UniProtKB/Swiss-Prot annotation:
It is found in: Cell membrane. The keyword Cytoplasm does not apply. It comes from Staphylococcus aureus (strain bovine RF122 / ET3-1). InterPro entries: Csa (IPR007595), Csa_sf (IPR038641). PROSITE patterns: PROKAR_LIPOPROTEIN. Pfam families: DUF576 (PF04507). This is Uncharacterized lipoprotein SAB0394. Residues 1-22 form the signal peptide. A lipid is attached at C23 (N-palmitoyl cysteine). It comes from the Bacteria. Belongs to the staphylococcal tandem lipoprotein family. The keyword Transmembrane helix does not apply. One of its GO terms (cellular component) is plasma membrane. Keywords: Cell membrane, Lipoprotein, Membrane, Palmitate, Signal.
Amino acid sequence: MRYLKRVVLYRIVMVLSVFIIGCDKSSDTSEKPKEDSKEAQIKKSFAKTLDMYPIENLEDFYDKEGYRDGEFKKDDKGTWLIRSEIVKQPKGKVMKTRGMQLYINRNTKTAKGFFVLKEISENNNRVNKDKEEKYEVKMVGNKIIPTEQINDEKIKKEIENFKFFVQYGNFKNFEKYNNGEFSYNPEAPIYSAKYQLHNDDYNVRQLRKRYEISTKEAPKLLLKGGGDLKDSSVGQNDIEFTFVERKGENIYFNDSVEFIPSK
């Protein structure tokens, strides 16, 4: 389901994009973009938002302002929604996901969320509800703890030791990323950048260490952002590392940081 959704959504974005900015056909693909080009603006915008990585202490989000659109009420300080999820589907086997989402409310300075394990049916690409496990969690003192008793010690330990990508990801070398594929839709506004990474990339090594990623294939990095390109605050920032993407075989990691109105 996630595989199909992200393929469809990405294609829609590409079709609606007013600017599809790739490598200049008439020049070397490694040539640096002009300062005023849309490509340069997109990369500069991502550089600003990715500069906040890592945020080791999630409680720092309580004091962090984000991009506010017309949906926010005047007295609402907003809520940060952070998510990290690994998706694995060995060849010929069922797709399984495991990850966590946390709502960090700046008004109440409280954070609650869920740790979720899912299986995706191969027949209809839908979540198998009989195989879905959801555990409520909260954050106290920068630590994630279950709000209910969990008999499975392995799951309990995984929750307590869980780290979001935003806590350890690092993009200090982002300016050196070359040969990106860019798209931009000013109406939304949404924009994206895609890069081919190498296995010696810091973030790739971190993901391999934490999630026992079996393939030796180097991943592609897809960045998706939302909000004003000229605004340095974060509205929506989605990160996807795709190691394997084939019919019946997938390995990818999703992470997102989004600033939303409080409920």
